[in-house]
Amino acid sequence: MSLTDTIRNTFVPIHREGYPFIAGFFVVSLILGWLWDPLFWIGMVLTVWCIYFYRDPERVTPMDDDLVISPADGKVSFVGLAVPPAELDLGYEPMTRVSVFMNVFSVHINRSPVRGKIDKVVHRPGKFLNAELDKASTENERNSVLIESPHGKIGVVQIAGLVARRIVCWSNQDDELSVGERFGLIRFGSRVDVYLPSDATVRVAVGQTAIAGETVLADYGTERGEPVVRIA
């Protein structure tokens, strides 16, 4: 086993998006330390925090087209019916929406909840309200991704918040995504909304902890027991 493999297997991986910021914090730490020794250690604490912020642990994703997997780490903050953002072109009828709120300590990498092809990616500028507020879905800055999945179109919306003011999405229209594949991140937390067809059965409840790429939010199967939440 090589040294690189040993490091990779011993420590939590860091996403490449974080490399410039980690390097920047480290260089600033060296400069501050040259001016005054205690400042070096303060800078190193911030560098370690930056490393923690951009951690990107591997996940074991269920490979089942009947499942919808959480796109984000965090807490389920909403389960119910809601009209999807207009830019997704999903119509004006309410759809099942599951929202996952990410705090500043969550893993910030976002993963595709389903396998499918991206129909469109639309970025909308907006406000930076508390992402836990319901109106943040329509008023805050957001990035909307429409995916054509084996069970139809679903919407995945990355929403900025009070602290999170930088949404990153490196996937583009016509890209093919695997379930659990990384497609973006939101710096300093915030929220991700998933809009599902009405025939999806929700398997999570408000307040439940979700793990990106692993937690089952909903499914289309008929033999998986009673749903956690019925959407009427």
From Swiss-Prot:
Cleavage (non-hydrolytic), annotated site positions: 189-190
Gene Ontology MF: a single term: phosphatidylserine decarboxylase activity
Pathway annotation from the record: Phospholipid metabolism; phosphatidylethanolamine biosynthesis; phosphatidylethanolamine from CDP-diacylglycerol: step 2/2
Enzyme class: lyase
Cofactor: pyruvate
Membrane topology, as annotated: Peripheral membrane protein
Places the protein is found: Cell membrane
One GO process term, biological-process aspect: phosphatidylethanolamine biosynthetic process
Assembly and binders: Heterodimer of a large membrane-associated beta subunit and a small pyruvoyl-containing alpha subunit.
Function: Catalyzes the formation of phosphatidylethanolamine (PtdEtn) from phosphatidylserine (PtdSer).
Name of the protein in its database record: Phosphatidylserine decarboxylase proenzyme
